[in-house]
Structure formats: C-alpha cells, structure tokens
Amino acid sequence: MRLSSLGEATAGSAAPAVVCGSRTDLYIACSCTEGQCSRADSMALNERGMQMDRGQARPAVRQPDERERKQRLVNRCFRESRVPDSESSPGTERRTAELSGFYTTKKLRSLYWTLRTDASLTAFAVAQERDTILISNRHHSEENLKLYQYDNVKSKLRRIQTITLPGGSVVACALPGPGFNVVMGEALRRTHDQLILTGHEDAVVNLIATSLEEGDARIIRRFNPAKYLRRLRAQYGDEAADMPWLQEIDSLRVRQLTPWRSVKTDATGFIALVNELIFIYTFDDTREPLYMHHFPGVESFDVNPENELLLALSGSKYGANGISLLDLTKMRGIGRQYAPAGHLKAFERAADSKHCLWLDKSLLVNSVGNILRVWDIRCSTGLKCEVLGHKSNITAVRYHKNSHTLYSCDEDGYIFSWELSHLLRELEGMTDVRRMTLCRSPQSIKTADDCSTTIQCGNIVVAPDTEFSSKRNSSVRSSSSRLGRLHLQFLGDGTLITLDALELGVHKVQDAKCYIAPSKNKLRRHSELPIKTLAPSAVSHAVESDSSLSSDSTLVERAQLEELHHDIFGSGFMSLDLHAEVDHS
C-alpha cells in the first residue's frame, strides 16, 4: 500500500494500515501489517492511537512543524549511528553533513619506508616533472643507483630500475629536467628519456642517459676536473707552489651538483662544488670548464631562479653572516663577489653557514647554526628578518615556490614548515618585520612591540620518534653519519620527501574531516548529533617536553596499513612494520 501523506491512504487501498507514533506526539505512518510493525527501529504505538478497521475513517493527523521535523531527523540519525557501518543506510552520511557533524581541516599525511641497514646511502635526488626518486647506495662493493616512481593516488613506490656504476662511490647526484635532453641527440632521444648526473669521490662527474621504462642506461659524457687541474698545475710551473688548492688534486671530492642552463646562449651543463672549487661545465665540452675558481671556506651555493649568472654562496669565510653573492656576468677571472657591507672583513667574527637558498629573484635565506636569516639584495642593509625555532644546528633547507613554504630540519630530527606568504606581503608593504617564530613557542610574541615586528608562521611537520629509534642498535644509528644530514626534496605537487640513514618519508598536506564526538551525558544524547567516536589519537614522542615541540597524530585503519606492508625496495630496502602512515595535525 502506498501512502501519499502522513496517515492518509491513497484511493483503492486494500490492506489495513497502522499509524505508529511516539510519546512526543510525532506521527510516522508506515505500511505495516495489522498487529505488528516491520520497522526494526519503529516507535511504540501512541497510547491514543487505535488500530483502524478496514473502511473506518482515520482521525486527522497533525502535521509536524519545523522544530519537530528537525528533532525527528536528529533522533533518526542517532538511531542509525548505533547500527554497524555495513548496515547503515546510504543517506546517513548526507544527513550527517546537513547537521554539521564534522569540520574540514588540513592534516599532514606521512608514509615511511625503512631502509636496509647493510646498505650505505650516499646520494639522493628527485625529478619533479615525473615524480621520479633517485637513491644511491653502496651494498658491499657495488655502487647502485635505484630509480623509483611515486604514485600519489595509491601511495606506493614503484621501482623502475637499478644501475650499477664503475669507479668511486657516488657522493652527489641530480636529475636534469626534460629541457636538458637535447644533449642526447635526436637518435638517442627516441629510446632514452631521462638524464642522470652523478658526482664521485674521485671528482669524476658522469652524465648518464636511460629509459624509465626500458632501462638500457649508458654513460654519454664524462667530466674529470682533477685531470684539468693537473694540466693547470703543469702550466703554472713553480708558481703552483703558492696555490694550495692545486696541491689537493689527489683528495678532490664532489660535494654538490646542480644542473645549469644559460638563457642567452641556450647552453646546457652543470655547476659542481669540488672541495672549495666551483666548476661550470657545458655538456658540449668535457675537457675545459666554462668557469673555475677557488673560494676558501665555501660550503654550498645556489643559482638565482631568474639569473643563471648570479650565485649565492654560504661558508665560513664570509663574515658574521656567512653569506656572499657571486656575479658571473663577464665569466672572467673570479667574477664580482658581494657581501653585506663590511662583513667580508670581519673574519674574527666569521659565522659558519652551511646552507643558502634563493626564495625568488631578490630574496635569499641562509642558515647560521640554529637560525635562518632572510636577505633582500635590493636593500643596503640586506638582512630583513631571522627565523627562530630550531634548538640544534640546521642540516637542510628547501623552499616550495607554489605554496610559499620554507622547510628546514635540524640535527635533532625536527622538520619545521614556515609559511612565507605572510612575510612576502609584509615586505611589499615595507613594514619592519624582524622575526619569524613558531605558532606555539616560548619565542612567540611577548610584548606589544612584538606585534608589529614578529610573524608567527612556523609549524612542526615531523618530530623524532625516540621510541622507534631506540629499537635500532647503536651501529645502525652511527651509520647515519655516512649520509651526513637529513635530505629534503619535493615532488611535482609539493609533496615533501625526506631521507636519512634509517628511513624514507613521504609527507603531504591534505584535507581531512574531523568528527565531533557526541556528549557522554546520556540525558543529552538524543538532542545532540550522534557521530561515531574516532579512535584515540597517538601522540608522537618528542625529544623534549616542550609543548611547542609536540604534535598529535591519528593512526589510520589497520587494513590500510596492511596494504603498505610489503617489500617495495627489493634488495636495497625493506618495508616498515606498522608505523607506516601517520597524520600530523
């Protein structure tokens, strides 16, 4: 029998109907057989309701008002929330959303894979165009390059190929983008689509061409800075004795590799930091570098994103701030080197800066101990503000341009993210910003003057899990010194990739629903939205008890973790046993 409205049967109805109601005078009509109700969650018969004989006129049923309809919807959602997930009705999620039982926020999803303890990691690089990850490790006497591709949809790593290299150990590597493939020639480009740069302990740099699907890797160029320096030493003759950097040829080592391309000449090549020497090679000439000079105390460099002839240098011989600029416009001699006014002369107060990084064409950042300093090369003073929050020396710095987010990590294993969009807007307004701190930190705003000079924009991305690390023996932890520091890289969509001697991590910020738990008061449960309570949060273990260095995490379901529990790295890696996915608030 079909009901057209509450309590009114359509014409031609033959079966008797039962009017079901609650003691709150809410009436619900259903097509039940006489004497029983087929609804599992039906309410008791209204004390005033009577079973109607066939053909007997029904009493008029009062239509519920807006308040009663809303109350009925709440009660129905509450009853359905106690039904198992497999038996809940499809409309439950829609009605839950209508009642605002959750709110959407941003959370960090982290995946980890444990690395094999008998393989020494030596280098790490990422190609953002194809989400390709390159890891170099040394297993016994073999030097292997392993290429992986990350699937963001399935959250899995697929191993593409393994390349075994001759010669010394790989200590630096890079993955040039598709724009550099012109060096392979037309014939080779038909079968090969990826270039790999590798720097070795004996200062040799190899350019490798490979196919991501078919393999067939081959070395197409080999650069030997040591051989060039030997020829240079022979040319100088007796004068070479006054050049200490020419006496260190036998101990040369590649420390940093960066693909390089000239906009004016369209030449492609790379910049290499070999000991304290900076080399610029083009792929067309393997014998003579385009540029070479010795910079005492240099630790790292970075190329300006809009001017390939402007380099930032950081080191221990650049005064109190450890930062310098190198202009190679003329490509003759040393070029022009700049530093903040008078700072190059202050060697007695020289700072040891390990990292430098361009944020855009005019802003750059460098690290000095546990402090990050932001510089504006358009200003005479240069220094704009300091980034405070780390309690140990900073070991790596990376910047994601699209999201205006700066990432930094320290020796304790903390990774912080700094939202620089606030700073960029403040700089455009030429306000007096002096400090950037964590959102919750003892170094936050303390006085009224701090409101105009301090920006709170830092968040904890990853905190060290001391309980997990303590399970590893001391010999494993000591092997982390082989890698030197925690490496940070990005995929094309901004997903953060971290690598140290123990594990590979993939971290991505995504939207997450946070459900509102119902009240524990039984007398109020019928009037509140009943939503299934989530499992208790798991708190990541921090090194210190400082509240600013602790973060909440939510573990995912066991079924999702079991899908990740497999050997994904082959002979070089093994899967992590259940701390695989963690959401950091």
UniProtKB/Swiss-Prot annotation:
Keywords associated with the record: Cell cycle, Cell division, Cell wall biogenesis/degradation, Repeat, WD repeat
Entry's Gene Ontology BP terms: actin filament depolymerization; cell division; cell wall organization
Keyword Cell cycle: yes
WD repeats: 179-218, 346-385, 389-428
Cellular-component GO terms for this entry: cortical actin cytoskeleton
Gene Ontology molecular function: actin filament binding
Region annotation Disordered: where it falls in the sequence: 50-71
SMART domains according to UniProt: WD40
InterPro entries: WD40/YVTN_repeat-like_dom_sf, WD40_repeat_CS, WD40_repeat_dom_sf, WD40_rpt
Record has Oxidoreductase as a keyword: no
Role of this protein: Involved in cell wall metabolism and required for the separation of the mother and daughter cells.
Family of this protein: Belongs to the WD repeat DSE1 family.
PANTHER family with a match to the protein in the record: WD REPEAT-CONTAINING PROTEIN 1 (PTHR19856:SF0), WD-REPEATCONTAINING PROTEIN WDR1 (PTHR19856)
Protein's recorded name: Protein DSE1
